[in-house]
């Protein structure tokens, strides 16, 4: 789901917390997962709570690949669209409905639809 924000809302935003790749496939399980990342989750939650309390914005960027993604020529198959790996970790899901959400099919967020 995406949060609908118009240009007036964007002009009122003073802070934007960008959350990148905190998905199950990088944090909890799968070929690209590194469970050590979990050690930053408590601080991440604190930052997200602070931003929400201030009425500021959160952007969530999720690694979400098509099954035939060219990236899989260089990296193991991971975070395929529609799988649990491509979902935000449970600890952060409560923010997803109120965030700007972008799904990227490459290593670069710049190629995510509607990002720029």
Model feature map: region roles:
Residues 1-105:
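Active-site acidic carboxylates
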Residues 104-116:
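Alpha-helical scaffold elements lining the catalytic groove of polysaccharide deacetylases
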């Amino acid at each position: 789901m995406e949060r609908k924000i118009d240009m007036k809302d964007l002009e009122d935003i003073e802070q934007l917390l960008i959350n990148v790749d905190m998905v199950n496939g990088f944090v909890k399980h799968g070929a690209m997962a590194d469970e050590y990342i979990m050690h930053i989750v408590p601080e991440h939650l604190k930052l997200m709570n602070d931003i929400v309390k201030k009425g500021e914005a959160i952007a969530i960027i999720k690694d979400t690949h098509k099954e035939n993604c060219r990236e899989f020529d260089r990296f193991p198959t991971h975070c395929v669209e529609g799988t649990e790996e491509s979902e935000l970790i449970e600890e952060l899901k409560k923010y997803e409905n109120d965030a700007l959400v972008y799904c990227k099919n490459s290593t670069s967020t710049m190629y995510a639809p509607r990002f720029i």
